[in-house]
Amino acid sequence: MSDSLVVCEVDPELTEKLRKFRFRKETDNAAIIMKVDKDRQMVVLEEEFQNISPEELKMELPERQPRFVVYSYKYVHDDGRVSYPLCFIFSSPVGCKPEQQMMYAGSKNRLVQTAELTKVFEIRTTDDLTEAWLQEKLSFFR
C-alpha cells in the first residue's frame, strides 16, 4: 500500500552510497544529506559530511526546505557501551511550499526502506536538531 504513495524513486548512485555508508568503519559522526530533484523525480545526494556534530549538522540544513538525512552517530549509552546507530531524520520545516512538502513526505517511506533504517525521526524546525534531542530519541532503543 505504501508503494502507491511513492512520489520519487531513489537515485541508484545514492542507493549504493547509502549501502556503503551503512558499513563504514570510521568511529566519528557522519551524515548524508539528500534532497528531491524535482525535474528527475528522484531523491539524490546533496552533501556528505564526516566528523559532524548534531549542532553542526543543523547549520547545513536549509531552514525553509525539506531534507532527508542519514546520520551515523556515536552514541554512548548510560552503562558506558558505545554504539553507532544509523538515524534517518526527515527535516520538514514549517513554512515549506505544500507541493514540496508532499513530494518529500510521499518519498520518505521508499527512502527509509531502501536504506533499511529503523530509527526514523522528524523535525519541524532545524533548531530541534541537537545532541540532547537525538540522545532522547535514541534512549527509546536499547
UniProtKB/Swiss-Prot annotation:
GO MF annotation, one: actin binding
Modification N-acetylserine, positions: S2
Ranges where the ADF-H domain occurs: 4-139
InterPro entries cross-referenced by the UniProt entry: ADF-H, ADF-H/Gelsolin-like_dom_sf, GMF
One Pfam family matching this protein: Cofilin_ADF
Signal peptide (from-to): none
Keywords tagged on the record: Acetylation, Growth factor
SMART domains referenced in this protein's UniProt entry, alphabetically: ADF
Tissue and organ expression note: Expressed predominantly in lung, heart and placenta.
Coiled coil spans: none
Record flagged with keyword Acetylation: yes
UniProt GO cellular component terms: cortical actin cytoskeleton; extracellular region; ficolin-1-rich granule lumen; secretory granule lumen
Sequence similarity: Belongs to the actin-binding proteins ADF family. GMF subfamily.
Protein's UniProt name: Glia maturation factor gamma
Organism: Homo sapiens
This protein's encoding gene: GMFG
